[in-house]
């Protein structure tokens, strides 16, 4: 079993830059980091694993179904825009209680973090954009196959396209993680955290921030 630690749910606000003391500027991503509310504490004795379930933000009551409404009411927590879980070590469970809040104090400037988000959806795309295929000749007798993928396989034997063949299809909107991003600045008053570099997804998308698993 790996080493688990508490994480944080934020929302990507956009990108900016920060000037260092020596005059250099570095690109940063700003993440809106309002307090996470603990909804449930899962234990290995009852649930088979140890985890902290949290929510963040708010949601109109008409958008909360009955099972979710009962779940939030049991915890006496305002309904948020979703539910997320973070696996933790059993020894960490005592640090949290249902209804309590998790803030930015779990992170520090200079710390390395892993960030997970949903990439931008690109819809249905061809092989050139989706898999970086090379285009066919623009002229020299080519009039129909400028962006064609090329051969899909053999003939009667094996008589099929092998699984995993790179073809056109839906691109983006998948879960992606970026590892070892440095925390550059934490603004507790504005509920913002700035990390070095880019993170997956569009502005406004939810992201999960965890302590780096590999350093």
UniProtKB/Swiss-Prot annotation:
Q: Which UniProt keywords apply?
A: Methylation, Ribonucleoprotein, Ribosomal protein, RNA-binding, rRNA-binding
Q: Which residues are recorded as modified (N5-methylglutamine)?
A: 156
UniProt cross-references to InterPro entries, sorted A to Z: Ribosomal_uL3 (IPR000597), Ribosomal_uL3_bac/org-type (IPR019927), Ribosomal_uL3_CS (IPR019926), Transl_B-barrel_sf (IPR009000)
One Pfam family here: Ribosomal_L3
The record's PROSITE patterns line, in alphabetical order, gives: RIBOSOMAL_L3
Cellular component GO terms held in the UniProt record: cytosolic large ribosomal subunit
Q: Does the keyword Ubl conjugation apply?
A: no
UniProt's post-translational modification comment states: Methylated by PrmB.
Q: Could you tell me one molecular function GO term of this UniProt entry?
A: structural constituent of ribosome
- UniProt record, GO biological process: translation
Which Gene3D superfamilies does the protein's record reference?
Answer: 3.30.160.810, Translation factors (2.40.30.10)
| Family per record | Belongs to the universal ribosomal protein uL3 family.
Outline what the protein does: One of the primary rRNA binding proteins, it binds directly near the 3'-end of the 23S rRNA, where it nucleates assembly of the 50S subunit.
Record text on subunit structure and interactions: Part of the 50S ribosomal subunit. Forms a cluster with proteins L14 and L19.
Matching PANTHER family, A to Z? 50S RIBOSOMAL PROTEIN L3, LARGE RIBOSOMAL SUBUNIT PROTEIN UL3C
What is the protein's name according to its record? Large ribosomal subunit protein uL3
Q: Which gene encodes it?
A: rplC
